[in-house]
């Protein structure tokens, strides 16, 4: 790290500092101050501080000779020769040296950066992530990295972090996790040897863009070792253990400031600054929507809580990708070896879509219900719910998935061609807009009255689904991570009012954690104001929930009058019987 940057950070240039080295006649006020200081018995006139450039600190009684006044301008002028194009700290001390954000008020990992770039660098280093340039791929002509851009090249952003002086050895080493099978880009199971290869390749990736080789030893996992429970990373349907979002309390460190939540009168809580290793919140107590109080004070490292949140995001991503893989196998002619190529964000491509046939459409069938059952069984703390609560969450998951998955698939492969893509890969052309079936004389277009009745029951719902859900949702331009978190959040939210008291406590805890994860995902992406983006996603829940309710009412009518021959499980789900 540049010593000039540290010098600028700890000793910013001020007029008072510069005047002490200039030949300016002292003012009467300064003489009075000097006299008062000289008359004080505690003031040592023989004190001459010295500056140790090796450690960038002032020390009394140092063996180094005191600095001379004519050497100071040379030190300051060296700021213009920053390594690898690093921005000069004297140009704009509050500007991020990575994305030029004006919110870089302090140093992060040795370089001046905003919180978003610091979070990006921390996660990249702690997870040993390597990136490929989305632009030309030429490091001499990097992509533009600016905080106002929605999509920033991660490869070029990481290089700029290194150029800004951010050092990987200052990032806390990632704790040892429970060994589980993780799907890689080729569908392989991670082994110990592969982990070593990944670590060595990551070292080569970082050292390619750094001038100094990493010589600091890696931190060994010790008493603050974090373990992820098996029920969280690889949930078992037979398991009844809830998701443990807490971490093992480590010993206190007096030198690390953080925020501690302590109980207060009533249900309110207040924050006080303490010297500990605690995070700004406890996930188990983060919700204020259910009764309870903190019985004891716990101290958790902030980085462990953040890792928990990112692992929760990865868990929901894997769960949704697994559901997409099942649909890809069920509804397309794809080959099995193509399923494991990468994370499946959308199971359908344009050439795999089929025209919608209202005559044979019957909604979810048995294999669809099995897919949703596997999907919802992976939800954290789902196994801790009561049987009736599981029934409610599963039913709501079927309804939400049917509508929201259709909106997301339409956004990915259908909106540009003005198509509504259904959950099973069927599409409906919306240009020209199809008739609803209620127009005068529309019955003459159908062979039988039964076909006309089925069409005018289904098509108005599909038209409303396209114009009131698919189009507004496409305008959000959600990422895959935002989509999977929003979907899980809506399932928990819409199920809340039918759950028992214990189920509502679990639901509130999961909702709060998902909202925190949404904010972290948006913040890491580099949005200028993550709160606004999260607010837009939360506001979309209103029209999504409205469409889910409209679909449920429509299917109730269709099953009651036998307009559509639905699966027997559909009749059972729409009955809402608890026993």
From Swiss-Prot:
DNA-binding region: 93-173
CC per GO annotation: cytosol; nucleus
Domain NR LBD as annotated: residue spans: 304-577
SUPFAM superfamilies: Glucocorticoid receptor-like (DNA-binding domain), Nuclear receptor ligand-binding domain
Comp. bias regions, Low complexity: 233-242
Positions of the UniProt region annotated as Disordered: 233-256
InterPro entries the record matches: HNF4-like_DBD (IPR049636), NHR-like_dom_sf (IPR035500), Nucl_hrmn_rcpt_lig-bd (IPR000536), Nuclear_hrmn_rcpt (IPR001723), Znf_hrmn_rcpt (IPR001628), Znf_NHR/GATA (IPR013088)
Subcellular location field: Nucleus
Keywords: DNA-binding, Metal-binding, Nucleus, Receptor, Transcription, Transcription regulation, Zinc, Zinc-finger
Function summary: Orphan nuclear receptor.
Family note: Belongs to the nuclear hormone receptor family.
This protein's name: Nuclear hormone receptor family member nhr-22
UniProt source species: Caenorhabditis elegans
Native organism taxonomy: Eukaryota, Metazoa, Ecdysozoa, Nematoda, Chromadorea
Name of the encoding gene: nhr-22
């Amino acid at each position: 790290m540049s010593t000039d940057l540290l010098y600028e950070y700890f000793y910013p240039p001020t007029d008072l500092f510069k005047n002490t080295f200039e030949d300016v006649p002292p003012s009467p006020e300064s003489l009075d101050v000097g006299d008062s200081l000289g008359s004080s018995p505690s003031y040592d006139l023989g004190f001459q501080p010295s500056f140790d450039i090796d450690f960038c600190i002032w020390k009394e009684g140092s063996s180094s000779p005191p600095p001379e006044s004519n050497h100071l301008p040379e030190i300051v002028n060296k700021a213009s020769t920053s390594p690898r194009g690093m921005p000069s700290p004297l140009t704009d001390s509050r500007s991020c040296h990575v994305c030029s954000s004006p919110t870089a008020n302090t140093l992060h990992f040795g370089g001046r950066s905003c919180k978003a770039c610091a979070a990006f660098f921390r996660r990249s280093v702690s997870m040993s992530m390597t990136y490929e340039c989305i632009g030309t791929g030429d490091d001499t002509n990097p992509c533009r990295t600016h905080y106002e851009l929605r999509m920033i090249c991660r490869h070029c952003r990481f290089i700029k972090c290194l150029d800004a002086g951010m050092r990987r050895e200052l990032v806390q080493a990632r704790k040892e996790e429970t060994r589980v099978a993780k799907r890689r880009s080729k569908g392989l199971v991670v082994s110990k040897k592969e982990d070593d290869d990944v670590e060595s390749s990551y070292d080569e990736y970082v050292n390619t863009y750094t001038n100094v080789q990493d010589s600091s030893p890696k931190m060994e996992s010790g008493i603050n070792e974090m373990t992820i429970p098996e029920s969280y990373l690889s949930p078992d349907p037979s398991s009844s253990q809830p998701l443990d979002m807490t971490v093992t309390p480590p010993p206190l460190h007096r030198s690390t400031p953080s925020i501690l939540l302590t109980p207060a009168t009533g249900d309110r809580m207040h924050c006080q600054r303490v010297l500990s290793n605690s995070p700004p919140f406890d996930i188990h107590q983060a919700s204020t929507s259910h009764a309870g109080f903190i019985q004891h004070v716990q101290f958790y490292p902030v980085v462990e809580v953040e890792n928990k949140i990112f692992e929760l995001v990865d868990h929901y991503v894997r769960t949704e990708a697994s559901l997409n893989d099942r649909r890809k196998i069920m509804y397309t002619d794809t080959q099995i070896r193509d399923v494991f190529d990468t994370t499946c964000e959308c199971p359908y491509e344009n050439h795999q879509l089929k025209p919608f046939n209202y005559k044979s459409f019957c909604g979810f069938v048995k294999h669809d219900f099995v897919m949703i059952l596997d999907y919802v069984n992976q939800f954290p703390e789902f196994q801790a719910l009561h049987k009736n609560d599981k029934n409610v969450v599963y039913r709501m998951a079927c309804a939400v998935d049917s509508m929201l998955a259709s909106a997301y698939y339409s956004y990915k492969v259908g909106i540009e061609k003005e198509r509504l893509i259904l959950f099973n890969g069927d599409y409906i052309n919306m240009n020209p807009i199809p008739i609803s079936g209620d127009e005068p004389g529309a019955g003459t277009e159908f062979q039988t009255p039964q076909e006309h009745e089925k069409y005018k029951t289904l098509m108005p719902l599909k038209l409303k689904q396209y114009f009131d859900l698919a189009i507004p949702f496409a305008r959000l331009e959600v990422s895959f991570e935002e989509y999977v978190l929003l979907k899980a959040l809506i399932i928990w939210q819409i199920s809340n009012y039918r759950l028992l008291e214990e189920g509502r406590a679990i639901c509130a805890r999961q909702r709060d954690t998902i909202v925190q994860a949404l904010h972290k995902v948006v913040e890491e992406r580099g949005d200028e104001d993550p709160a606004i983006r999260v607010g837009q996603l939360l506001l979309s829940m209103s029209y999504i929930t409205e469409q889910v309710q409209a679909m449920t009412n429509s299917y109730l009518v269709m099953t009651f009058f036998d307009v559509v021959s639905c699966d027997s499980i559909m009749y059972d789900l729409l009955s809402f019987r608890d026993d």
